[in-house]
């Protein structure tokens, strides 16, 4: 959340392929935004793609990648999930929304969403739980998590256990935004 395609520039520049798409998940022109609307926009965006996708997602992007792979198994060649949750911790969302309510409206401008839209969007994810559907993901999966990303480390380890085909990489001295802390690591994994 709060990232743009520009935040992935350092990773993308190191990739051995040129056909890379970093979709913007939020649009300031949309009045109402929800998790399902973002997922629907991605499904529409990739509906005509013939070749299976190699999807890399961080945080919300990882959650969307998991959901997309469950819903469109035939369209996904592999997943790289960074700082991933597969079951949204409702207490964390509630705490996050409490913090959001205390923040000034100006703090949300860089995301392209208003404060109220951000709170509604976060609330729309409150009940997401893909635990029972993870066995539908059959493609290779790489799970990455920064050692300092304490909010997602446990879930990343559990995800590795729930997906037998998954490999787990804990990146030392890195926090949540691995595209900023360890772009070389992500690029190396995506290039293999």
Indicate where each model-derived feature is located.
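Catalytic histidine-centered segment of alpha/beta-hydrolase-like enzymes
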Residues: 174-184
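Short beta-strand/loop motif that positions the catalytic acidic residue
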Residues: 136-137, 143-145
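Conserved alpha/beta-hydrolase "nucleophile elbow" surrounding the catalytic nucleophile
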Residues: 1, 57-62
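Active-site loop/oxyanion-hole signature of alpha/beta-hydrolase fold enzymes
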Residues: 2, 9-13, 19-54
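Flexible "cap/lid" loop of the alpha/beta hydrolase fold
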Residues: 63-66, 70-71, 78-105
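Conserved alpha/beta-hydrolase "acid-adjacent" motif
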Residues: 150-155
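Short beta-strand immediately N-terminal to the catalytic nucleophile in serine-hydrolase-like folds
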Residues: 55-57, 82
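Hydrophobic, aromatic-rich cap/lid helix
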Residues: 106-130, 148
């Amino acid at each position: 959340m709060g990232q743009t395609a520009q935040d992935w520039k350092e990773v993308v520049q190191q990739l051995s392929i040129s056909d890379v798409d970093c979709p913007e998940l939020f649009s300031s022109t949309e009045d109402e935004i929800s998790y399902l609307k973002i997922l629907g926009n991605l499904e529409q965006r990739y509906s005509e793609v013939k070749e299976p996708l190699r999807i890399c997602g961080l945080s919300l992007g990882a959650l969307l990648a998991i959901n997309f792979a469950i819903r469109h198994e035939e369209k996904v060649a592999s997943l790289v999930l960074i700082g991933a949750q597969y079951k949204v911790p409702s207490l964390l969302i509630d705490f996050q929304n409490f913090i959001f309510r205390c923040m000034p409206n100006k703090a949300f401008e860089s995301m392209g969403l208003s404060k109220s839209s951000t709170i509604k969007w976060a609330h729309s994810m409150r009940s997401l739980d893909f635990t029972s559907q993870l066995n539908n993901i059959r493609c290779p999966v790489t799970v990455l998590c920064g050692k300092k990303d304490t909010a997602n480390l446990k879930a990343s380890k559990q995800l590795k256990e729930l997906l037998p085909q998954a490999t787990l990489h804990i990146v030392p001295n890195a926090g949540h935004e691995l595209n900023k802390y360890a772009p070389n690591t992500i690029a190396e994994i995506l290039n293999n």
